């Protein structure tokens, strides 16, 4: 557990998204040893092998902008919020694609996301806002993995999400 100290994207502009120093999804150091370790665990143990590529775009974008700013973006500047989520997700999916190439069929489960969409008593966003802004990106994410690996997909979400559970199952 950690507390967010500073959010790096201060402005709600496309230029701010472009200026941000995004990670290089093709940095070979990110994947060093992944193929060998996955193969070893798959062949030499009885454990389920889980690839953790967490594409939690909702929470990460809230951290990039600051929680309050991001929620304001979703409500008042959805074009910017969607551009930020799309940029983040593009990078995470490139990382996932490269990781999947490395591990091949040596995984049993892929950790798709851990976006917390609920609070103690309700969803963070209205079901309408979820459906319009978040669900299409989740669908893109889930379809990405469904199309690339037979591994089971693992999705984690905290909170009271009953109003959107059918959307998540879909």
Model region roles, listed by residue range:
Residues 15-170:
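Active-site loop segments of alpha/beta catalytic cores
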Residues 8-14:
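Active-site phosphate/oxyanion-binding loops
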Residues 7-8, 24:
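Long, hydrophobic/aromatic-enriched structural stretches that serve as scaffold segments
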């Amino acid at each position: 557990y950690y507390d967010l100290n500073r959010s790096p994207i201060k402005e709600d502009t496309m230029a701010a998204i472009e200026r941000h120093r995004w990670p290089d999804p093709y940095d070979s150091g990110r994947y060093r040893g992944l193929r060998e370790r996955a193969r070893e665990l798959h062949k030499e143990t009885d454990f389920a092998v889980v690839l953790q590529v967490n594409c939690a775009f909702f929470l990460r974008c809230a951290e990039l902008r600051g929680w309050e700013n991001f929620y304001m973006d979703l409500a008042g500047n959805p074009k910017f919020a969607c551009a930020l989520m799309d940029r983040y997700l593009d990078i995470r999916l490139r990382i996932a694609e490269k990781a999947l190439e490395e591990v091949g069929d040596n995984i049993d489960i892929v950790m798709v996301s851990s976006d917390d969409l609920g609070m103690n008593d309700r969803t963070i966003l209205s079901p309408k806002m979820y459906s319009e802004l978040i669900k299409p990106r989740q669908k893109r994410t889930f379809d990405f993995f469904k199309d690339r690996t037979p591994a089971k997909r693992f999705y984690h979400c905290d909170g009271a999400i009953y109003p959107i559970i059918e959307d998540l199952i879909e």
